[in-house]
Amino acid sequence: LLPETVSLFGNYLKDQIMMPDKSEAVKPSHLFYQSRTRRPLATHAEGIYIWDESGRRVIDGSSGAMVVNIGHSNPNVLAAMKAQMDKATFIYRLHFENEPAEELARQLVRRMPEGMDKVFFVSGGSEAVESAIKLARQWAVATKQASRWKVISRFPSYHGATFGALSVTGYDALTAPFTPMVPDMPKIGAPTAYLDRDNLTYEDRGLKYADQLEEKTLAEGADSVLAFIMEPIGGASTGALVAPDSYYGRIREICDKYGILLIHDEVMSGAGRTGKYLGGDHWNCRPDIIAMSKGLGAGYVPLGAMIASDRIVQPVLSAGGFAHGYTYAGNPLACAAGLAVLEEIDRLDLLTNATVMGERLKQGLLDLAEIFPFIGDVRGKGLLLAAEFVADKNTMAPLPAGLNAYQHIVEIAYKRGLIIYSRRSRGGVEGDHFLICPPMIITAEEVDLILSIIKDSLEELAQMLDLPVNR
């Protein structure tokens, strides 16, 4: 690898660090993931809390990796899983259909935009995105549009770790090591209108960013462009980025004009986290294909889904079938758990709670931005929220990368009993931000506790890095 590639990837690995207390004896481990750094050993979890082997309780303020939408150890989900385990844990879809998969598909379709009525189950977000790209390509071939193969995406963005998903990911720290092996798909700028200092209105900025799709399509050759993939509300790569309202409708117009399929990556924003079941529902979006995971299984099982319109699926099936599949697609145990998660979202009215508690949490973060002027932006919807650090609020200049503020804030908050999630919003190299995305079951008292810990953590960060504070 080139030195700069090693440096970028090394910084990404540092993002993952959550160190146990150095005084603890650490047992040898044969596991490895992103790095050799060890984590504390969790013993159990319930609600919004996780306990380690020392008995210490921490608040899961990021829902794991924005996964545990309905909280840990929900008894109704566990009971549904146990009931299914007593029947069958694996049924291969080429041999039999199974009722949990059929019912979960029916319930998902009820929550989708009109016309999105075909479901393909997978085990995770990368698989969901991979499936979406492959379905789009097979649709083009089946409808005699084989010249269409390019999938335009945004920079920065993150769509998964498999090679197809990486090809549409715009995050150098993750893509650089694999550059020779991964197709270089076209990119346009993410709609970071909050950074712009121009004479345009906010909505005109949204149109400006959306129009990049038309410009890129024409530059690439419209007949070669297959699809455009985007997160309706950004995830970790952009820190809960929300585009101006004008952006979403214009994107659909451009896709329709040039026959481009619109793929929504709802892996992080879907399953209710933003206060709507889909992030795109805030703008009545009409994508052609949707990728979901994370909150769909809510941490109880590995589960994801690709949902598409019959207009896309039928030509593929008529041309010989979808040349794609996974061993655990439609697994009855996973689908029984996913169905129970949906039922809990409805029973507990968690879409409403995500909206109300999200407003409380967001207002609290905005109040903290008045005290800590190095918070330049607070954004997101529902309980998918982020705060970005800056050196200057007027220019939105980022903090110096060498301060590593995004790493320090995670370490400080964890020491105080709160898990948060951090990255860099501007291509992974600067623009420190932290995400705060607690489970959707959170109460007002728990929101206030989180805000209190964040305030204390920001105080310590300011003192550590000599950042300004308004007393």
Report residues per predicted region.
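Short, Lys/Arg-enriched N-terminal segments with co-localized hydrophobic residues
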Residues: 5-17
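Conserved N-terminal phosphate-binding loop of PLP-dependent enzymes in the Aspartate aminotransferase
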Residues: 17-471
